[in-house]
Amino acid sequence: MNYIVMRGGRGASSSYGGDRNTGGTGKPMKFYDKTKSFQGMTKHEFENAIRDKTVEYIGVFNDKGELLVAGTSYSPNAVGVPTNHPRWNEVHDLTHNHPYKPANEPNRTIGATFSTADVENHLALDIKGETRAVSNGPNENTYIFRAKAGAKQNKNAFLKHSQKSEGVWNRDSTKKVKEVEKRLAKQGKTLSPAQRNQIVYGTAKHSWKSKAVTRAGYEYIEVKKSHW
């Protein structure tokens, strides 16, 4: 049975949301089914429809490219994963947006790449195809990771790489911000919140580019200029 909880202005939340979300909090989130709004779209059409959203949306597709379910939790930080949908067992690809100008972070200009939560979900939910994240910040469009064809996948190594990437991101972004602030101070200038934010999230993209991904049997793809 699909229990419904009414929410003024948002329509009804469905029972599709399971015990996982894209934010990695380990807590279920209300899932608002928006499949009808995107019905009939290809994966790339759906991604172009959500990349400018200020809250996270998610869509899952089967191996024939059919949209199974799409929706949102109306949060700029995460969206519930609809693992309770009756056709979840057909899921092949999972895509979602990383808001680059969310209401809770007015100075954020980059959606940024994957978090450890994205990798954990991909592995725990046994996504057979791709996990994708889309945004529309400067020089970014689509981030993709997937198992490398013909390679043996080492899930533990892949997860460790993502965790290490977050550590490198935090360390290097702090260092980079300080370097830029010091250089600007000599010129009598300051770093704006938007510029600081761009440095922080830009560093995240670089931390993912490592041979460790390939050694673990996966591919990481960053599409900068064309919307796939």
Explain the meaning of each model-derived region.
Residues 29-52:
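Beta-lactamase-like hydrolase cores
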Residues 69-79:
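Structured interaction and signal-relay segments at domain junctions
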Residues 47-52, 59-60, 84-85:
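Short secondary-structure boundary/capping segments within folded domains
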Residues 1-22:
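Short turn/helix-capping motifs enriched in Asx and small/polar residues
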Residues 16-27, 78-228:
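Active-site-proximal loop/helix of nucleotide/amide-processing enzymes and allied scaffolds
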Residues 56-63, 130-136:
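Short beta-strand scaffold segments in enzyme catalytic cores
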Residues 65-66, 140:
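Detector for glycine-centered tight turns/loop "hinges" at secondary-structure junctions
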Residues 19-21, 53-57:
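A domain-level signal for caspase-like cysteine endopeptidase catalytic cores
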